[in-house]
A protein has these predicted regions:
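AAA+ P-loop ATPase motor domain of ring mechanoenzymes
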Residues: 2-28, 53-62, 139-140, 144-145, ...
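Short glycine-/polar-rich loops that comprise or flank the Walker A/P-loop
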Residues: 18-19, 43-46, 86-87, 118-121, ...
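Short, charged/polar "capping" segments at the starts of alpha-helices
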Residues: 30-34, 57-58, 99-101, 130-133
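P-loop NTPase Walker A phosphate-binding motif
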Residues: 33-45
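Short regulatory helix/loop adjacent to the ATP-binding pocket of P-loop NTPases
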Residues: 36, 127-145
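Conserved P-loop NTPase "ATPase switch" module shared by AAA+ and STAND
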Residues: 49-112, 121-125
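AAA+/SF3 P-loop NTPase mechanochemical coupling elements
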Residues: 93, 114-122, 263-269
Length: 276
Protein backbone atom coordinates (compact mmCIF):
# COMPACT_ATOMS: atom_id res chain seq x y z
CA UNK A 1 0.00 0.00 0.00
CA UNK A 2 1.14 3.60 -0.57
CA UNK A 3 0.27 7.12 0.45
CA UNK A 4 -0.59 9.67 -2.21
CA UNK A 5 2.98 10.86 -2.81
CA UNK A 6 4.32 7.31 -3.19
CA UNK A 7 1.35 6.37 -5.36
CA UNK A 8 1.93 9.34 -7.65
CA UNK A 9 5.62 8.47 -8.04
CA UNK A 10 4.87 4.82 -8.85
CA UNK A 11 2.13 5.71 -11.32
CA UNK A 12 4.38 8.28 -13.01
CA UNK A 13 7.04 5.63 -13.61
CA UNK A 14 4.46 3.23 -15.03
CA UNK A 15 3.10 5.86 -17.41
CA UNK A 16 6.59 6.76 -18.59
CA UNK A 17 7.50 3.08 -19.01
CA UNK A 18 4.27 2.59 -21.01
CA UNK A 19 3.15 -0.39 -18.95
CA UNK A 20 0.29 -1.82 -21.08
CA UNK A 21 -1.98 -2.72 -18.17
CA UNK A 22 -2.10 -0.96 -14.79
CA UNK A 23 -4.52 -2.00 -12.05
CA UNK A 24 -5.04 0.59 -9.32
CA UNK A 25 -6.35 -0.81 -6.03
CA UNK A 26 -8.38 1.88 -4.29
CA UNK A 27 -11.89 2.62 -3.06
CA UNK A 28 -11.39 6.36 -3.73
CA UNK A 29 -11.88 6.89 -7.43
CA UNK A 30 -11.84 10.69 -7.14
CA UNK A 31 -8.40 10.76 -5.47
CA UNK A 32 -6.98 8.41 -8.09
CA UNK A 33 -8.34 10.51 -10.97
CA UNK A 34 -7.05 13.68 -9.30
CA UNK A 35 -3.54 12.20 -9.34
CA UNK A 36 -3.94 10.94 -12.92
CA UNK A 37 -4.99 14.43 -14.05
CA UNK A 38 -1.95 15.97 -12.36
CA UNK A 39 0.34 13.51 -14.14
CA UNK A 40 -1.36 14.12 -17.49
CA UNK A 41 -0.61 17.84 -17.15
CA UNK A 42 2.91 17.38 -15.77
CA UNK A 43 4.21 14.98 -18.43
CA UNK A 44 1.81 16.19 -21.14
CA UNK A 45 0.36 12.88 -22.33
CA UNK A 46 -3.18 12.24 -23.62
CA UNK A 47 -5.27 10.39 -21.03
CA UNK A 48 -8.94 9.50 -21.41
CA UNK A 49 -11.28 8.36 -18.64
CA UNK A 50 -14.34 6.14 -19.04
CA UNK A 51 -17.19 6.13 -16.52
CA UNK A 52 -20.72 4.75 -16.58
CA UNK A 53 -22.19 8.23 -16.07
CA UNK A 54 -20.21 10.27 -18.63
CA UNK A 55 -18.79 7.89 -21.20
CA UNK A 56 -15.21 8.61 -22.30
CA UNK A 57 -13.77 12.07 -21.62
CA UNK A 58 -10.41 13.80 -21.98
CA UNK A 59 -9.13 14.10 -18.40
CA UNK A 60 -7.44 17.48 -19.03
CA UNK A 61 -10.11 19.33 -21.01
CA UNK A 62 -13.11 17.40 -19.56
CA UNK A 63 -14.42 17.22 -23.12
CA UNK A 64 -16.47 14.14 -24.02
CA UNK A 65 -14.91 12.14 -26.85
CA UNK A 66 -17.29 9.15 -26.85
CA UNK A 67 -20.82 9.17 -25.47
CA UNK A 68 -21.15 5.37 -25.22
CA UNK A 69 -21.41 4.80 -21.46
CA UNK A 70 -21.21 1.00 -21.55
CA UNK A 71 -17.96 -0.73 -20.64
CA UNK A 72 -17.98 -2.67 -23.92
CA UNK A 73 -18.45 0.54 -25.90
CA UNK A 74 -15.66 2.24 -23.97
CA UNK A 75 -13.30 -0.68 -24.58
CA UNK A 76 -14.14 -0.73 -28.29
CA UNK A 77 -13.39 2.99 -28.53
CA UNK A 78 -10.11 2.56 -26.62
CA UNK A 79 -8.92 -0.37 -28.76
CA UNK A 80 -9.83 1.45 -31.98
CA UNK A 81 -7.88 4.57 -31.01
CA UNK A 82 -4.90 2.66 -29.60
CA UNK A 83 -4.59 0.80 -32.91
CA UNK A 84 -4.54 4.12 -34.81
CA UNK A 85 -2.43 6.31 -32.50
CA UNK A 86 0.56 5.64 -30.29
CA UNK A 87 1.11 6.33 -26.57
CA UNK A 88 -2.56 6.72 -25.61
CA UNK A 89 -3.74 5.99 -22.07
CA UNK A 90 -7.29 4.98 -21.15
CA UNK A 91 -8.55 4.78 -17.56
CA UNK A 92 -11.63 2.69 -16.74
CA UNK A 93 -13.39 3.34 -13.44
CA UNK A 94 -16.24 0.80 -13.43
CA UNK A 95 -15.46 -2.63 -14.88
CA UNK A 96 -17.19 -5.62 -13.29
CA UNK A 97 -16.69 -9.38 -13.72
CA UNK A 98 -12.93 -9.23 -14.21
CA UNK A 99 -12.02 -11.86 -11.60
CA UNK A 100 -12.51 -14.85 -13.91
CA UNK A 101 -12.10 -15.93 -17.51
CA UNK A 102 -15.18 -14.43 -19.18
CA UNK A 103 -16.23 -12.17 -22.04
CA UNK A 104 -15.41 -8.93 -20.21
CA UNK A 105 -11.95 -9.99 -19.03
CA UNK A 106 -11.08 -11.41 -22.47
CA UNK A 107 -12.28 -8.20 -24.15
CA UNK A 108 -10.00 -6.27 -21.82
CA UNK A 109 -7.18 -8.75 -22.46
CA UNK A 110 -7.46 -8.18 -26.21
CA UNK A 111 -7.31 -4.43 -25.67
CA UNK A 112 -4.14 -4.76 -23.58
CA UNK A 113 -2.51 -6.87 -26.32
CA UNK A 114 -3.24 -4.04 -28.77
CA UNK A 115 -1.75 -1.57 -26.28
CA UNK A 116 1.49 -3.60 -26.10
CA UNK A 117 1.96 -3.29 -29.85
CA UNK A 118 1.21 0.45 -30.01
CA UNK A 119 2.77 1.73 -26.78
CA UNK A 120 -0.65 2.31 -25.25
CA UNK A 121 -1.74 1.80 -21.67
CA UNK A 122 -5.04 0.68 -20.15
CA UNK A 123 -5.54 1.56 -16.49
CA UNK A 124 -8.22 0.00 -14.31
CA UNK A 125 -9.44 1.37 -10.95
CA UNK A 126 -10.84 -1.50 -8.91
CA UNK A 127 -11.05 -3.15 -5.51
CA UNK A 128 -11.52 -6.64 -6.92
CA UNK A 129 -9.06 -9.33 -7.90
CA UNK A 130 -8.18 -9.58 -11.59
CA UNK A 131 -8.10 -12.57 -13.92
CA UNK A 132 -4.49 -13.84 -13.52
CA UNK A 133 -3.82 -14.10 -17.25
CA UNK A 134 -4.77 -10.44 -17.65
CA UNK A 135 -2.87 -9.28 -14.56
CA UNK A 136 0.36 -10.88 -15.82
CA UNK A 137 0.37 -8.41 -18.72
CA UNK A 138 0.87 -5.45 -16.40
CA UNK A 139 1.50 -4.16 -12.90
CA UNK A 140 -0.49 -3.21 -9.81
CA UNK A 141 -0.30 -0.12 -7.62
CA UNK A 142 -2.39 0.71 -4.54
CA UNK A 143 -3.53 3.96 -2.94
CA UNK A 144 -4.03 4.10 0.82
CA UNK A 145 -6.51 6.31 2.63
CA UNK A 146 -5.05 9.76 3.47
CA UNK A 147 -2.37 9.75 6.16
CA UNK A 148 -2.00 12.58 8.69
CA UNK A 149 0.03 14.82 6.36
CA UNK A 150 -2.47 14.57 3.53
CA UNK A 151 -5.42 14.78 5.91
CA UNK A 152 -4.01 18.03 7.30
CA UNK A 153 -4.25 19.50 3.79
CA UNK A 154 -7.82 18.17 3.46
CA UNK A 155 -8.84 19.72 6.79
CA UNK A 156 -7.38 23.11 5.88
CA UNK A 157 -8.98 23.04 2.41
CA UNK A 158 -12.37 22.42 4.03
CA UNK A 159 -12.11 24.91 6.88
CA UNK A 160 -10.02 27.92 5.80
CA UNK A 161 -12.38 29.12 3.00
CA UNK A 162 -14.94 29.92 5.74
CA UNK A 163 -12.51 31.95 7.84
CA UNK A 164 -14.22 35.25 7.16
CA UNK A 165 -17.81 34.03 7.17
CA UNK A 166 -18.03 32.16 10.50
CA UNK A 167 -16.27 32.12 13.89
CA UNK A 168 -13.23 29.80 13.70
CA UNK A 169 -11.25 29.20 16.89
CA UNK A 170 -8.93 26.57 15.45
CA UNK A 171 -5.18 27.18 15.45
CA UNK A 172 -2.41 25.18 13.78
CA UNK A 173 -2.30 22.68 16.66
CA UNK A 174 -6.06 22.14 16.35
CA UNK A 175 -5.78 21.46 12.62
CA UNK A 176 -3.08 18.87 13.33
CA UNK A 177 -5.18 17.21 16.03
CA UNK A 178 -8.19 17.04 13.70
CA UNK A 179 -5.98 15.52 11.00
CA UNK A 180 -4.71 12.89 13.46
CA UNK A 181 -8.28 11.98 14.42
CA UNK A 182 -9.52 11.77 10.82
CA UNK A 183 -6.44 10.06 9.37
CA UNK A 184 -7.06 6.77 7.52
CA UNK A 185 -10.63 7.74 6.69
CA UNK A 186 -11.42 8.35 3.04
CA UNK A 187 -11.24 11.94 1.85
CA UNK A 188 -15.00 12.20 1.27
CA UNK A 189 -15.74 10.76 4.72
CA UNK A 190 -13.48 13.35 6.36
CA UNK A 191 -15.06 16.15 4.33
CA UNK A 192 -18.54 15.00 5.38
CA UNK A 193 -17.54 14.92 9.07
CA UNK A 194 -16.06 18.43 8.88
CA UNK A 195 -19.04 19.80 6.94
CA UNK A 196 -21.38 18.39 9.58
CA UNK A 197 -19.43 20.17 12.33
CA UNK A 198 -19.37 23.48 10.43
CA UNK A 199 -23.08 23.30 9.61
CA UNK A 200 -23.88 24.77 13.02
CA UNK A 201 -22.23 28.04 11.96
CA UNK A 202 -18.99 27.96 13.95
CA UNK A 203 -15.96 25.82 14.71
CA UNK A 204 -14.70 25.83 18.29
CA UNK A 205 -11.94 23.97 20.11
CA UNK A 206 -14.59 21.76 21.72
CA UNK A 207 -15.50 20.49 18.26
CA UNK A 208 -12.19 18.59 18.15
CA UNK A 209 -13.61 16.12 20.66
CA UNK A 210 -16.81 15.85 18.65
CA UNK A 211 -14.92 14.65 15.58
CA UNK A 212 -14.39 11.24 17.18
CA UNK A 213 -18.09 10.97 17.98
CA UNK A 214 -19.03 12.05 14.46
CA UNK A 215 -16.89 9.23 13.05
CA UNK A 216 -19.15 6.71 14.81
CA UNK A 217 -21.98 7.67 12.46
CA UNK A 218 -19.93 6.54 9.46
CA UNK A 219 -19.22 3.00 10.59
CA UNK A 220 -21.57 0.11 11.25
CA UNK A 221 -20.85 -2.71 13.67
CA UNK A 222 -17.82 -4.81 12.77
CA UNK A 223 -18.35 -8.55 12.62
CA UNK A 224 -17.67 -9.95 16.08
CA UNK A 225 -17.70 -6.54 17.77
CA UNK A 226 -20.76 -4.66 18.93
CA UNK A 227 -20.68 -0.95 19.66
CA UNK A 228 -22.54 -0.22 22.91
CA UNK A 229 -23.83 3.29 23.49
CA UNK A 230 -23.48 4.35 27.14
CA UNK A 231 -23.88 7.60 29.04
CA UNK A 232 -21.04 9.21 31.04
CA UNK A 233 -22.53 8.08 34.37
CA UNK A 234 -21.96 4.45 33.38
CA UNK A 235 -18.23 4.86 32.72
CA UNK A 236 -17.21 3.92 36.25
CA UNK A 237 -16.03 0.32 35.96
CA UNK A 238 -15.07 -1.56 39.11
CA UNK A 239 -11.47 -2.69 39.40
CA UNK A 240 -10.06 -0.16 36.95
CA UNK A 241 -8.98 2.56 39.37
CA UNK A 242 -5.34 1.69 38.71
CA UNK A 243 -5.85 2.03 34.94
CA UNK A 244 -7.61 5.36 35.39
CA UNK A 245 -4.75 6.65 37.56
CA UNK A 246 -2.18 5.51 34.99
CA UNK A 247 -4.09 7.16 32.13
CA UNK A 248 -4.23 10.44 34.07
CA UNK A 249 -0.45 10.34 34.55
CA UNK A 250 0.18 9.50 30.89
CA UNK A 251 -2.32 11.97 29.41
CA UNK A 252 0.31 14.32 28.00
CA UNK A 253 2.20 11.46 26.34
CA UNK A 254 -0.98 9.91 24.93
CA UNK A 255 -2.06 13.16 23.27
CA UNK A 256 1.35 14.49 22.21
CA UNK A 257 2.62 14.79 18.65
CA UNK A 258 5.11 11.94 18.37
CA UNK A 259 5.85 12.16 14.64
CA UNK A 260 9.51 13.00 15.31
CA UNK A 261 9.85 9.61 16.99
CA UNK A 262 7.82 7.89 14.27
CA UNK A 263 5.15 6.96 16.80
CA UNK A 264 1.46 7.74 16.98
CA UNK A 265 -0.60 7.99 20.18
CA UNK A 266 -3.16 5.25 20.91
CA UNK A 267 -6.74 5.93 19.84
CA UNK A 268 -8.36 4.54 22.99
CA UNK A 269 -8.68 1.64 25.40
CA UNK A 270 -10.59 -1.52 24.49
CA UNK A 271 -12.18 -3.28 27.47
CA UNK A 272 -12.78 -6.96 26.85
CA UNK A 273 -15.07 -8.94 29.11
CA UNK A 274 -14.68 -12.71 29.38
CA UNK A 275 -17.92 -14.60 30.21
CA UNK A 276 -17.69 -16.53 33.49
Amino acid sequence: MANKAEFKTSLLRMFRARIPFISVRSIERARVLETVQQLAEEINIPIYVHSLSQGTTDIKSKKMVNDDRSVAGGLDYAVQNISQRQNLTFVFTEVSDIEDDNLVSRHLYDGVVQAIERGGSICLITTKSIWPQLQRLGMTVALDAPNEEEMLEVVKECVTPYKGSMPLEWEEADYKMAAAILANMTKIEAENVLATQMAKGSLTKDDIKELSNAKDKLFSDISGLEKVKIDPSALSVAGLRGLQHWLDNQKQLLTADLKARKLRPPRGVLLVGVPG
